[in-house]
């Protein structure tokens, strides 16, 4: 088990938390990051790109001139791809870029991302963070005290006040623990977890 300090919102140590080495202190596998981030970005692509081929371009139904004895190259339509205003040959079509990554790979990559933030000393665990209402200035002050200005804050989805407070901060964001992913961990400088959230991650990733 790895020991982690637990802080209050002013970064005063209030206790320690034992967490599984396999989840928070394992080996960092950067290739797993590549696999899951690539899949995430692929699934985010809209894939709506399209061009008109010769069957979709309007007009061009009539043969421009007779087949023989004109001295010109034979043509069947003024909407063939070699004509100005013609359809595109073999152009892009709408498609779905998403693909599945095995569940074991996704879990291993998430464990590796947590271990990376832990080794870089960019993982901060707070006892709890339950603001009375959405107060962005107060959230900025807390993150500054924790040394985590551009941070990903993770807690229960029900903590709406915290979510709304953090999401107004440039460079910081809030995620529900169920939606935690490698891409968002890596694109933020620090990771802030509540003690309960850390235990939930330990249980789900062990």
From Swiss-Prot:
Entry-linked InterPro entries: Ribosomal_uL4, Ribosomal_uL4-like, Ribosomal_uL4_dom_sf
Keyword list, A-Z: Ribonucleoprotein, Ribosomal protein, RNA-binding, rRNA-binding
GO molecular function list: rRNA binding; structural constituent of ribosome
Region (Disordered): 48-97
Domain of life of the organism encoding this protein: Bacteria
Signal peptide feature range: none
Any single Gene Ontology cellular-component annotation: ribonucleoprotein complex
Ranges of compositional bias, category Basic residues: 63-72
Pfam family name, one: Ribosomal_L4
GO biological-process terms attached to the record: translation
Known role: One of the primary rRNA binding proteins, this protein initially binds near the 5'-end of the 23S rRNA. It is important during the early stages of 50S assembly. It makes multiple contacts with different domains of the 23S rRNA in the assembled 50S subunit and ribosome. Forms part of the polypeptide exit tunnel.
Record-stated family: Belongs to the universal ribosomal protein uL4 family.
Assembly behavior: Part of the 50S ribosomal subunit.
PANTHER family: 50S RIBOSOMAL PROTEIN L4, LARGE RIBOSOMAL SUBUNIT PROTEIN UL4M
Protein name per Swiss-Prot or TrEMBL: Large ribosomal subunit protein uL4
Native species: Anaeromyxobacter dehalogenans (strain 2CP-C)
Organism lineage string: Bacteria, Pseudomonadati, Myxococcota, Myxococcia, Myxococcales
């Amino acid at each position: 088990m790895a020991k982690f300090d637990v802080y209050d919102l002013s970064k005063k140590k209030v206790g320690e938390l034992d967490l599984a080495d396999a989840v928070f202190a394992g080996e960092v596998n950067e290739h797993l990051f590549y696999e899951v981030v690539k899949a995430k970005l692929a699934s985010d692509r809209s894939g709506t790109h399209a061009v008109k081929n010769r069957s979709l371009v309007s007009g061009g139904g009539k043969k421009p001139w007779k087949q023989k004895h004109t001295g010109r190259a034979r043509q069947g339509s003024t909407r063939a791809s070699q004509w100005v205003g013609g359809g595109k040959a073999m152009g892009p079509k709408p498609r779905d870029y998403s693909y599945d990554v095995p569940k074991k790979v996704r879990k291993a990559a998430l464990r590796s991302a947590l271990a990376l933030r832990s080794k870089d000393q960019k993982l901060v665990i707070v006892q709890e963070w339950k603001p009375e209402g959405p107060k962005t200035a107060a959230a900025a002050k807390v993150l500054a005290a924790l040394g985590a200005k551009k941070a990903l804050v993770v807690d229960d989805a029900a903590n709406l006040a915290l979510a709304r407070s953090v999401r107004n901060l440039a460079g910081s964001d809030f995620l529900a623990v169920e939606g935690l992913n490698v891409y968002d961990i890596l694109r933020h400088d620090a990771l802030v977890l509540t003690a309960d959230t850390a235990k939930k991650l330990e249980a789900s990733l062990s």
